[in-house]
């Protein structure tokens, strides 16, 4: 009888020990688990063909072929300070997006590359645009997109586009809003609108925005154009 009781206790203790080990192992596996991609992220990142988009940029020491994704510089302290000082990271994603747009509109003055730099096309990095406080359409769009991501809006919701609009070639930011998980235009210089994000037309419904040559977010670039050669000689929107 004593032996049976002792044996039962040993089995119980062993069971408790194994249960504890399983619990610990399960927790460790959860901690190591790779986060699953948001299905909306997967959808929008696969809706259009991915392409390598290279911008030919002229520097003092020569010409460089730059992957357009390098225009995202979300660790720049100037951008981080703007977001923090102006509380651009407060509110819903839609509210943050609009606050970022309004900040760019209020603080960056539009000027053509030809007037500012003497050449028809020169894409500035965000820190350059912030220093000069002025820039062409793509310059403000690049600042806007960076601010939005630093404001903790998921990267896949933020996209910079280059293409045709009514009047010529243009670069602008689009945003996948929370309202219906569809993209809308956030344009800081061409038909700027201060209306709430939820009240905007879908990008696809905007009558004055035509075909896109290419677009990109922080991780991927999309479109048929593999270099910027297709932009040469295009008529830029004033």
Question: What positions do the PLM features span?
Answer:
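A structural boundary/capping signal
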Residues: 1-238
């Amino acid at each position: 009888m004593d032996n049976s009781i002792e044996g039962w206790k040993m089995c119980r203790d062993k069971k408790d020990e194994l249960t504890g080990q399983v619990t610990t192992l399960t927790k460790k596996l959860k901690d190591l688990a790779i986060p699953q991609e948001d299905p909306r992220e997967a959808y929008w990142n696969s809706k259009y063909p991915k392409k390598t988009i290279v911008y030919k940029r002229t520097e003092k020491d020569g010409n460089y072929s730059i992957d357009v994704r390098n225009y995202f510089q979300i660790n720049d302290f100037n951008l981080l300070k703007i977001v923090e000082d102006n509380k651009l990271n407060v509110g819903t994603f839609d509210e943050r997006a609009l606050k970022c747009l309004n900040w760019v509109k209020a603080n960056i003055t539009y000027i053509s590359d030809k007037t500012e730099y003497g050449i028809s096309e020169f894409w500035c990095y965000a820190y350059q645009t912030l220093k000069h406080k002025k820039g062409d359409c793509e310059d403000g769009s690049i600042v806007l997109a960076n601010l939005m991501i630093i404001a903790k809006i998921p990267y896949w919701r933020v996209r910079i586009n280059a293409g045709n609009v009514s009047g010529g070639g243009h670069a602008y930011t689009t945003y996948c809003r929370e309202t219906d998980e569809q993209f809308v235009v956030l344009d800081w210089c061409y038909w700027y609108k201060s209306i709430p994000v939820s009240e905007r037309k879908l990008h696809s419904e905007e009558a004055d925005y035509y075909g896109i040559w290419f677009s990109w977010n922080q991780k991927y670039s999309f479109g048929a154009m593999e270099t910027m050669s297709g932009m040469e000689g295009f008529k830029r929107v004033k």
